[in-house]
Structure formats: C-alpha cells, structure tokens
Amino acid sequence: RLREISDEAFSRVEKVANFDRSAAELQVDDLLEFFWVSCPLKDDYPRSRRRAESLMAARKVTRDFPASKWAGPVDKSSLDGLRESVIPRDAYREMSDEELWKKYRVARGERLCGVGLLKRHGRRGQGDDFFSTSHIAAMPLLERLNTEHRGAVDKYIGTLRDLGISSDALDTVPKAHSVFGYNDGHLLFSERLTEFFSGERLEQAQEALQNFLEECFDGDRPFPYYAILHADGDHMGTTIAHQESIEKHRALSRRASSFAQKVNPIVESFKGSLIYAGGDDVLALLPVHRAIECALTLADTFRQQMSDFAFSGAEGDLLVQPTLSVGIAI
C-alpha cells in the first residue's frame, strides 16, 4: 500500500519537475521495519507470553545497520538528516521560490529525501486525511465565523482565485467548515501566502487577507500555535500480566480496541484531527484552547472502558485500575 501511495505521488511530481526517483523509491522501501517473534504455546500461557515478550525485547535492542543502496555525494534531508536529498541542486539555482514550492512543495532552504517528498505530496484517499497544523492553529478564528461572514469568505477566496492561486491550494481539507468550506486555515496566515504569490500579486493577496480579517474578526490574526496530544495507558503491562488465559487476554485486547474506536469522534468533537489511535496509544492535533478538555474526556473514557480489569496491587488490599496519561505539547 505504501508503494501505491508513493508511486502516485512521485508520478505527479515527475510530470512537472526532475528528481532522483530511483533513490526516492529505495528510501521509501527502507522506511518501514517489522519485528516478530514466536515461541511454542504450551499449557502455561503466562509463561509462554513472558517468553515471547523477552524475545521481542531482545530483538528490538539488536541493532543491525545494512549499507544504504542510495548513498551519494549529495545534501542530506533538512527535515531529519537521515537520508540524502532527491531534489537536484540545479533546481534551487534555476527556480524561483514560488516555482520551488509549486513543483516540489519545498522552501529554498529545505532539502527533501524520498520520504520527505512523499510526506509533502502523498495522498491516501478521501476521508483518510487529517488537518494541516496551520488549519488547527487557525481553528479558534474559524470557530468565530458564522453565516453572516459567508459573503466575506467568498470575496476573499474569489480574490485569491483571480490572482491565480493554484487549484490544489484550495478545497484541500478533508472535512468542510460550515462557512470557510474545504479551504485550509493556512490561508488566514499572511506569511503562508508567500507560498502561492510573489511581488505585486503577493501584496494584493495580503491586502485582501487584511480586509477579510478586519471585516470578520475586527483585525484579530490567528496565533501560530497548536497542540500535539499524546496519550498512553498506565499499568498496561501489569494488567496484561494479570490475564492468566488466552480468553482473558483477548477480552482485554477487545476492550482496548473498543476504546480506540471511540477516540476519533471525541477528537473531532473538540475540532481536532486524529493521527493515530491503537489500543491505549493516541496521537492527535488539537486547537490549543480545546486540548485540555479533550485530554480529560479521553482519560475518563479510557477509565470507564477499562474498569473491569482492575487488579490487586502490591499491598494486596488496593485495587489498581488502568488509567490514561495524556501529554500536551504546544
């Protein structure tokens, strides 16, 4: 599936710009790494499970470093420094800032490897995307829009169209706002307009944005901050260890899966965007002013879901129940 996504993305880039596709494909193929272990399942299920966990821990700390198949005397990716850039150096000398962004989705000071290029251009299908960080950051302003502002929105977006904004810069979010439509909140940031315009057209676009902000928000500008929420279950290892049969372990897994299915509706109710939810592990983007309330709701939901799996603690008279710890970075 990953190769299907990368093939589609790389083919689109290849139509408008040169890049080292061979190296990019090798880098994407090398991205994912899977470990698995197995051991005989005998009558003592807890012992077999502990043996499997021990083998997995040993495999994870066994480091092997095969030589890369794409190494060359080129710049490293500026995103993580792990892989070589696949964008030719000539492109930065020959193209304008606007052209670099339009063709590669790259700023002049950036270098992208195949994985970075895939992240900028990859499409996973309708309904399977999440909001951009700029859209999340703009959400406090977007929530203030109402039907009275529809005319102002149409006028602003219409001006951007008249100025020649690329078609793929509009109607890009997976879920429409009641007034702002499918347009990304990054259009509310003056500095982001430099990705689409330059010179006199940039000045006109920024003036149109300023007029829009004045009319709809009394001149208030969006703050460039958003929240990253990461949640992880507490006492889960000990809880698993207390499941003495396959049936009990499966029941615990089903309950954790049930919680994961409840996460996306919760995150969306707080105007956030879920990146990942699996068992007791959650990663999401949220507007800053909604993050704490979302964290409390997730923790309460997890506690209710896991209430049947409390166990006696070390003292013997104290019940320990799985809970959810939530961290928020802004």
Language-model features, listed with the residues they occupy:
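Regulatory/sensor and coupling segments of signal-transduction and defense proteins
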Residues: 1-278, 282-330
